[in-house]
Amino acid sequence: MKYLKFFFIFIIATTLGICAHFALPRTAPTKLPPSYAKSSVLLVPLDSRPVCSSLPQKLGQLAGLNVILPPKAYLDNYKTPANKEKILQWLQINKKYYPYSIISADMLLFGSLLEARQRIATPAEETALLGKLATLTKSQDEKPVTIFSVIPRLLVSDELLPDRWYAYQLLRYSEYHDLVRITGSFALTQKMRQTEKKIPPEVLQKYISQYQQSDRFNLGLLALAKKTPNTKLTFGQDDASPFGLPHASAQKIKAAIYSKKLQNKAQLTYGADEIVALLIARCFLQQADWQPKIYLAYASTQTEQSVMPYMATTTANALANQLALLGAQQVAAPENADIVCYINCGTDKNPPGKNQAQEVQKLLEAGYKVAIIDSSEDYEPQQLLLPQLLKYNVSINRLTAYAGWNTFSNSSGTALAQAVIFAARLRQLQQTGADSKEIIALYAQNLNFTLERILEDYYYQKTIHPALRQQLIAFGNDPTKLDETEKQAAQNYIQSKLALNAFTLLHTNLGRTPFYSDGSKEYYITSLAVSSSLPWNRVFEVDLDVWTSVGMK
């Protein structure tokens, strides 16, 4: 009986300890006003994936912009291309009603990014689309339009057979071809010819033709922009490297921009999926008539000049390019900045740790608006900054922005877009003497967006997705070709894991400190709910939403 008594005391003490560990501060529920759109943007997305459709819409909501997409029935669904004709008709009908349009040329030419990687458009198709775009922009020339087009990526599509069997040889050929173009080296020419012999002629010709077709069409877009005063262009260099046929295409576009004197109307950037986020942010900054000042803080001395996977340039060059696209200004000191952008490019040899976490916490405590770009060389969680922020109890609820998905440019473009939109919207509210509840609501709305990125970019992409993929393969299922039963089982698994992650995040970090204080009152996140689904019959991406409640103390 004596030992039983001590056992019950131990159980009760342990239970109380766990409850105390997960307990949140006591607060009074607070109802915040909803946000309303002040303007609208018409968007023809790159494809229907959430990062190209719902993410831009959520960024638009943060900016007070209603981002309007074509009907879902018109859009692509994984391997089924979009109904291009229906989308073009929708655009022709609706464009005149909205002040600004962002149009993916790849969607209108191919029906999706995936289709653009697998099919080569004919000259007749290009000419027809350019003609329709010319009519569209001329007939509504008082309404600004930005058209964006993506240069084919370096690696051949995994969906193409037998092409993907020669992916490595095609990559090497592409790099040698570009280096020979630049240097004229006889030795490199010999290596290029040796590599060429290892590739079937029809496979090589198809690969080269992709870039020839892209060059031809993009030069046509430049000619179109030359004739239409309110048409701007953005060209993206998708999944590339410092040398290769994509780099050669980018150089052709750059030369054409200068020769046609279109520097104020056309830009080249590094990436694809994040382009719309940057363009929406640029649109809002132009409406707000504001140029934000950005200070770039690197997690290590190696970060600035590192070339991350699938990037055609260094992190410093990529960031300078995106700041120019936004119309933002880089400054040399944090005290002169509206936003401090903290950049991690973790590697096995140089992972982030306690020092980096403390640097971020000091910036937050000093009152800076801190946006984090969290990238990793091998897409491994131990190379990311976020786990270190959680380990050392950094107040992640005070971050202005966070992104850590896929490539470096995907992450940097998303984080920069969120940060400048939030800072510009806050500035607007403060200048117009908005009610304090509106400012608190903006902070809460921005935190919602940040939490979606944390739950998706870190918890799903870096922890749940790899484990789920391995399980599917172990049971003989293809993670890229799920049937409906497999998809539902995968969704149930993902939802249960994300719900647990959200609960843990709320009770161990997010809800324990205020996300906003006005000097007399503090505001806390008191609940965090998450819902998720697979947009396509594969596990590569997830469609994710979060809901939070706010309490006042």
Residue ranges of model-derived segments:
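Hydrophobic membrane-insertion alpha-helices, especially the h-region
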Residues: F8-H21
